[in-house]
Regions:
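Contiguous beta-strand/loop segments that form the cofactor/metal-binding neighborhood of enzyme cores
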Residues: 77-170, 207-221, 238-241, 254-263
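Short, surface-exposed helix-loop/turn micro-motifs enriched in polar/charged residues
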Residues: 39, 134, 223-226
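Aromatic/hydrophobic pocket-lining residues that form π-stacking "cages" and hydrophobic walls in ligand
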Residues: 1, 27, 240-241
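Short catalytic/ligand-binding loop motif for oxyanion handling, primarily in non-cytosolic enzymes
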Residues: 22, 51, 153-154, 234
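Rossmann-fold NAD(P)-binding glycine/threonine-rich loop
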Residues: 1-11
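Predominantly a Rossmann-like dinucleotide-binding segment in NAD(P)-dependent oxidoreductases
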Residues: 10-13, 18-105, 113, 248
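C-terminal helical cap and adjacent loop that interface with cofactors, partners, or active-site loops
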Residues: 173-263
Length: 263
């Protein structure tokens, strides 16, 4: 698909919704301006309620392909790689654990370290095995970015807006037929990545993303969308993390996509 896109010269983009949030756009602009110098160290931590993998995995028999990195970690990895734009990853070493979600055929957590051509290191960590009662309805993210002249510390866990009630609260991701296994009474509001509903209307990042896409195709604006090539690279990097964890060894990058089908 990517080859066809490139051969046709099509402006194909991928919807990584986090890119359209004000806080991350602000961080991106400060990095473009060089306000913390040359970035050399990044640490990213994503925490997710286990309702998401349980609800997602129920839809397929190919459960070994639905890992925390490939399904959900791709969003925080994309954000981190976008903020590291211009730097080339040359290796990844990762580890995974499956103490809880093994009965559903997936991993609980995957932690990894990317090394870049210029020596920059990026620690990418995700756990989507948090309890159903965890107040974050979907995603909680922390990113630390250290440069030669400064640092940017991003706290995006949504703990600044908390709802507690005697009434049972729904999950953030509840496809048809899925019911949380226990009652939930506390929510970190705004932790649902696409945005929030007000009077039947969606407000938030996905609204911005959609309007920005219209502006891109109508007016030729240079928008924050991920290109098809960036989306493909994100997929390859998440799969490389899983491959490293599977075989217990560092994986050189870039990796030939065909290698994923050899064993």
């Amino acid at each position: 698909i990517l080859k066809a896109i490139n051969d046709a010269g099509v402006d194909a983009v991928v919807g990584y919704t986090q890119r359209f949030r004000r806080r991350f756009l602000t961080v991106k602009e400060r990095l473009i301006q060089g306000q913390i110098g040359d970035v050399h160290s990044v640490v990213t931590r994503a925490f997710m309620n286990r309702m998401v993998p349980i609800a997602t995995i129920a839809k397929t028999n190919e459960r070994h392909n639905l890992t925390p990195m490939v399904v959900s970690g791709t969003h925080s990895l994309d954000m981190s790689m976008w903020l590291l734009e211009g730097k080339k990853p040359v290796s990844i070493y990762a580890k995974s654990v499956d103490k809880v979600l093994s009965e559903w055929g997936t991993k609980d957590s995957t932690f990894g370290i990317f090394t870049f051509e210029d020596g920059t290191i990026f620690s990418m960590n995700i756990s989507w095995g948090l309890p159903v009662v965890w107040p974050g309805s979907v995603y909680g993210l922390e990113i630390g970015i250290v440069g030669t002249e400064g640092v940017i510390d991003i706290e995006d866990t949504h703990r600044d807006l908390v709802l507690a009630t005697y009434k049972n609260l729904p999950g953030g991701y509840v496809p048809e037929g899925f019911e949380p296994s226990v009652d939930r009474h506390v929510d970190f509001l705004t932790s649902y990545p696409p945005g929030d509903i007000y009077k039947g209307q969606l407000w938030g990042p996905m609204r911005e993303e959609t309007n920005s896409w219209f502006a891109r195709i109508q007016g030729g604006l240079d928008t924050p969308h991920a290109t098809a090539a960036e989306g493909h690279a994100n997929l390859i990097h998440t799969m490389a993390m899983d491959r490293s964890a599977k075989f217990g060894k560092e994986i050189a990058l870039p990796i030939d996509p065909e290698d994923f089908y050899k064993d």
